[in-house]
Amino acid sequence: TGADPRRILLMTFSRRAASEMTRRVERIAARVLGDRASIMTEGLTWAGTFHAIGARLLRDNALEIGLDAAFTIHDREDSADLMNLVRHDLGLSKTESRFPAKGTCLAIYSRAVNAQAELEAVLAKSFPWCVGWAEELKTLFGAYVEAKQAQNVLDYDDLLLWWAQMCAEPAIVEQLRSRFDHILVDEYQD
């Protein structure tokens, strides 16, 4: 009988890996189902990156978690540009001694957010040359979050954080359990 492809969730880290995972399913389906393989592959609508799947689930459940479903997603480059704009607005791009560049600021922010760690600990461990800028970075990160909220923007870190928050809601978790029979995660060990 097999599994209903509409009830399978396939996730991976990169678009390339998601495409490869989908191609593998297509090859297996063609080998097993022959001419009927399209039934399997066309029904496989929940395959993609963690961020893409997360964005889709967040839009589906936005009202329940207090999120505007019309959010825009910033990729790393867009996020770095917004960080730079906020950095400039705060006058941090014109300091006497060189303030960290936008990419470094975004890396620090992302590390702190994803690790749910204190900024000072992140700086000491991974960015020791930026320790002297801790207070300015806190101000920058607060303004960056405000700018994202004002623009209804989520960055890649936000997608994962909101997804984790969404999965803390028992009703939503139950809905997800009833939606999927199989969850396949590529490179799970990573």
Task: Place the predicted regions along the sequence by residue.
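Coupling/switch/interface segments within P-loop NTPase motor domains and analogous charged loops
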Residues: 77-148
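Generic, low-specificity signal for short hydrophobic/alpha-helical stretches with a mild N-terminal bias
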Residues: 7, 39, 65, 87, ...
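Surface-exposed helix-capping loop/turn segments at secondary-structure junctions
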Residues: 33-37, 63, 88-98, 149-156
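P-loop NTPase Walker
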Residues: 1-69, 73-74, 80, 151, ...
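Conserved helicase NTPase motor core
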Residues: 9-12, 17-18, 46, 71-79, ...
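Conserved protein kinase catalytic domain
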Residues: 22, 26, 51-55, 106, ...
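Non-catalytic alpha-helical coupling and interface elements of nucleotide-dependent molecular machines
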Residues: 3, 26-33, 58-63, 84-92, ...
